[in-house]
Structure formats: C-alpha cells, structure tokens
Regions:
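Ubiquitin system architectures
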Residues: 1-88
Length: 88
C-alpha cells in the first residue's frame, strides 16, 4: 500500500479574516482544492471561481500542489483571491 504524501496548508479566506488549515495530498490540483473548500463550507461557490496565491505567485488551477511545495516548509500559507479579474 502506497502512502499518500501530504502537505500542511493554511488557506486565508478572500473576504473574512478566517483561516482553514488541513493536510492536503500533494497530488491534489488547485481546482480539486477549490471544490473541497466549497464542500467544507469555507468558501462559497461563485461564477469565475477563485485564484490561489502562494508566495505572491498565482497557482494554476490544473496544477497539483506538489508543483509549488518548497523544500523544508512546514506549512504553506495560501491566499484565496475571489475578485473577478477582467483583462482588457
């Protein structure tokens, strides 16, 4: 049986000053994390979805968490950005 690698993550809510902390499987994509956080009731489902920001870098929704885990970090601080961005 293969053990699933996990990384502790602390998500900050886009509007409220609240946090959600959990050990996340490193093969989970940010889209899957978004769906999970909606299921947990931490964020609300909304048109346009959310962006996840780690160390001032916007994470790709299709990318797994493992693409962004720095070596030796105990807990990743991930901001959730919920504002609609319009490109002109």
């Amino acid at each position: 049986m293969t053990e699933v690698m996990k990384q502790k993550c602390r998500f900050s809510h886009p509007l409220r000053r609240t946090f959600f902390e959990e050990d996340v499987p490193v093969d989970m994509t940010f889209k899957e994390m978004q769906d999970h956080l909606i299921e947990e009731g931490f964020i609300e489902e909304k048109k346009g979805g959310y962006q996840f920001i780690f160390e001032d870098h916007m994470c790709k929704l299709a990318a797994p968490l493992s693409d962004y885990v720095p070596e030796g970090v105990e807990c990743m601080e991930i901001r959730i950005h919920g504002l609609l961005i319009v490109l002109t």
